[in-house]
A protein has these predicted regions:
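Acidic/His/Gly-enriched intrinsically disordered linker/tail segments
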Residues: 1-53, 57, 63-98
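Beta/coil-rich, acidic/histidine-enriched accessory regions frequently appended to metallopeptidases
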Residues: 68-174
Length: 174
């Protein structure tokens, strides 16, 4: 279904508008894993990013290159010769672009949907905040966190910490 949504989007660039409910649902589930069933019907965005990065023909190449037992991530990493670290960096870049929809093919149509991500943070003391457990990012999922931009010249310090092994940290296949 992600493939079908991606192909529909190629034919109808205004897909984000006329089937806006898919974008609304995607925004509710950006924390889910890239291939999670929740995003099946409304997340062609990674395919768009890959095609933007590697050319319009890339999606077809990806589909034709898939081997038995591979998912799109496995195929992508294999045909682009990426390490896991390189893939993680690329998925981070993709997620950043999804905040503003900063991709040439869609930016004119999608700009009105920029900066609409929301994430609830709970104060946990000592100026630390935690994403709610139900919105903790899964593999290649992300949270868009709005920041209040301080005055120019203001020094800010941020510390990010994933606390593996605690009750609030979910692990799979470790």
């Amino acid at each position: 279904e992600m493939s079908a949504q991606y192909m529909l989007w190629q034919v109808y660039p205004e897909w984000m508008t006329f089937e806006n409910y898919h974008l609304i649902d995607f925004m509710k589930g950006t924390h889910y894993a890239f291939l999670h069933a929740y995003n099946t019907y409304h997340s062609p965005y990674v395919f768009e990013y890959w095609s933007n990065k590697r050319g319009i023909d890339f999606f077809g190449d990806l589909c034709r290159s898939t081997k038995l037992g591979e998912d799109p991530v496995m195929t992508y990493k294999r045909i682009t010769s990426q390490t896991q670290e390189q893939f993680n960096d690329e998925m981070f870049d993709a997620s950043c672009k999804f905040i503003t929809w900063d991709m040439p093919r869609i930016e004119q149509i999608a700009h009105k949907y920029a900066n609409q991500h929301t994430t609830t943070l709970n104060a946990v003391g000592d100026d630390w905040y935690r994403i709610t457990k139900d919105k903790s990012p899964q593999n290649y999922g992300y949270n868009g966190i709005k920041l209040k931009v301080p005055k120019a010249g203001t020094k800010i310090i941020l510390h990010f910490k994933g606390i593996a092994g605690t009750d609030s940290f979910s692990t799979t296949n470790l």
